[in-house]
């Protein structure tokens, strides 16, 4: 995953960052050491937190649909991404988190 051309970001059941590849940190304009252990919602604009929480809850249930989202880079600018999130479960079926792949997207008004 470290050499993946897209950003890869793994969050646990509490939405804390447990893994990210270099590309994900690069997309967000930050470092891996700054990302690991941080709440994933720290990379959102306040107006997007409620929608992100809803998507997180939907992904817990295994919804496979990709979605487009806006993230907040370290410098405060917007990053528009297409996200494919996959829920992670242990052998007993308990939800453990989500692995997401993130690719650059254009804002809807630029399409």
Question: What are the language-model segments listed below?
Answer:
Residues 1-13, 18:
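Sensory modules in modular signal-transduction proteins
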Residues 65-70, 75-84, 89, 99:
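PAS/PAC sensory module
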